[in-house]
Amino acid sequence: MYKYTLIIFILSNLYAASPSPVFGENGMVVSSNINASKVGISILKKGGNAIDAAVAVGFALAVTDPGNTGLGGGGFMVSVTSEGEIFTQDHREKAPANSKQNMFLDENNNVVEGQSLHSRSSSGVPGTVDGLINAWTDYGSGNIGLHQLLTPAIKLAEKGYELSHTQANELNYFK
């Protein structure tokens, strides 16, 4: 009996500690950084759509949360337009243009130790910037220019922003 009471007590405390759901009527922006989320909200208020906001948030996160996002990586986008069109975009990194199928093999078709990890050719070409701009070009509202999407991230980079407790701890760890 006490075993089940303890389990119910633990589960009820976990549920009680969960944040309450939040609902929005005209749009909502959620990201890993409040500054980036505010950028997305401002884009929506200026007449942008969800893609405009997502692109602006993506660039802002490259500044405010570079450990989890960044211009040197890639990603995917899965979305639904206001007309109900479902689309996906692949923004992942790509192999360099001069890549060849056997570029990490020697003349005997044996793997060259370390070359696939520690050579210029082993690095992928980032896809984030191109992907975000393509998403905006293909599915943006047309009401917001690229300059308006990039300016908030540039301002965050130039003027700075308050770090979260977690970010401050991470930076202090590497002091």
Region annotations inferred by a language model:
Residues A17-K38, A50-K175:
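Noncatalytic scaffold domains of N-terminal-nucleophile
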